[in-house]
Amino acid sequence: MGGVRETMACIFCDIVARRAPATIVYEDDEIMAFKDIHPQAPIHVLVLPKLHIATVNDLEEQHIPLMGQLFMVAKHLAAQWNIVRQGYRLRVHVGRGGGQLIDHIHMHLLSGRNY
């Protein structure tokens, strides 16, 4: 199964399981979004699957609907926060060399700062 697993060493899995605190802004059965603890913009949230998948490189065909749902949640949050017109950034880092600090696939939604 590659990087798909439940792990006690993952801070994002701990947040999903409510073992670690976070300011949750969205949650459904498969996806969670919460504010980044080190925001790089006035709006900076992380959108992630509750299922532990380490990186994009660990995705399998069965994860296609789940990854599509990440984008739909980001779209929903952008509309909710009225940032659709001004624009926003969606960012995914892959591996340490790509800037990924937590081994749990996640998308950054950022807005409110000029890039």
Stretches found by the model and what they are:
Residues 1-115:
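HIT superfamily nucleotide-processing domains
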